[in-house]
Amino acid sequence: MARTEMSVRPTPPSSVLRPVTALQPADASVTREFTLRKLPNTCPDSMWMINDLGWDDITERPRLETTEIWSFINKSGFSHPMHMHLVQFQVLDRQPFEIIGGQVVPTGPAVPRPAEEGGWKDTVRCDPFEITRVIARFDGWTGLYPYHCHVLEHEDNEM
């Protein structure tokens, strides 16, 4: 039996994070909107949808080397962690709204993302009755970019 001893000096984490170059909204060639909601008069927890579509063909086809803004409009009383595959994005802002006469009506200005949401993401929390905007640069992948809610029951039912 052998015994090995090592001297380990823990290194404290850096107090300075690597800077992240912010993507600029002016560089976005496309803005897309995704409405998150539960369809009325359906099974209790099974019909959460994006843009009222389920099990449909591909509806978004970002072009390689382009920048896009995606707005997640959460019309539900439930937070949705929206996840995008094969691309990282930055959170831009959130804007509260009410639904008046079936229309989304902002109730205040867009609020810039908090510091803890700085940096690159692949999942963003979309809170109830808020528009959450993210910006992404579609580089390095010529295939499809799947996206979905990361709540398992919602994901399984095509949200």
Each predicted region: which residue ranges?
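Short acidic/polar inter-strand loop motif in beta-rich domains
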Residues: 153-159
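Edge beta-strand plus adjacent loop/short-helix module at the start
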Residues: 1-140, 151
